[in-house]
Amino acid sequence: MHVTREPASFHGGKVTTLEASPAGVVLNATGSAIPLLTFRNFSLRCDKSDPKVSFQTPWNWDVIQGKKIAVITSNSYLRYQLIVGLAGLVPPVSGNFFGDCVISWPVAGEGGLDGRLRISHGLDFLSTVYNDCIEQSKVSLDEFWELLSGMEIYPNLIIKELSGSQKDFFFLALSVLFAFDFYLIPKTKYLMSKAAKPLRMLLLRQLEDKSLISTSTNNRFLREFCTDGLVLGSQGEILFSGGLSESLEWADRNLEQSKTSESDENLFEVDLKLTNLDASSDVNDDF
């Protein structure tokens, strides 16, 4: 997804570690750095059962290049909505986000590929759409194909005919191959598995000067991949922002039920209502 910067009078602030207000809320401060992504009056749906419940206070802040942000919240539906919202799969309830960057599809997701395509045809399609991201990639096609062959995944195979473990490996490898400016990482159970270790190393290489937002609840992943934390209340209110360790500690002390299970990642495997409108049909969430 390519997000193009548009003219705006908004001069939001970058999210940094700041002094807390008397209520314990970390405030935003203005910054001179050029933002990679700007949220302006941005609000998402927060309650699966009630489409009228959205952000208590709309977001007006920037993500600065190089920030790797772990979103920490006890609201699993909000985590889900944030990823699909930034991926462009659902519209925000209000406001928008913009920036001069290319946002990934959710890492380890299917990238919109039809399962009837052959592996080579799927790669050709995405390489055409994300041509710049292939040209700037720190992962070579030779590395990509070599890793796939180790899992007996070959160019002429049809995607839907891969085994479950082959699909997991293929879709993660595909996400790692492209050099996006901004990565969305919701699921990390497979990424942090032994089988995915070679891909994990390549993703770290690809992310060296990039930005990401992750809604993972895997602390090992967060400590390995993220630099900053953003603690959210159940209605999207920013309760705390700062370094990853202090954000995790703050959430453990103050956020009710902040220690969540990776079973939350199943939200990305089943049919959920992706829309923020009340009267629309379900969409199959295969990314």
Feature annotation, model-predicted:
Residues 2-6, 10-62, 70:
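A short, flexible loop at the N-terminus of ABC-type nucleotide-binding domains that lies
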Residues 38, 65-131:
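ABC ATPase nucleotide-binding domain signature region
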Residues 217-225:
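Conserved H-loop
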Residues 224-232:
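Conserved catalytic segment of ABC-fold P-loop ATPases
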Residues 38, 44-62, 68-74, 83-86, ...:
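Glycine-rich phosphate-binding loops of nucleotide-dependent enzymes
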Residues 232-275:
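Conserved beta-strand-loop-alpha-helix hinge in the C-terminal portion
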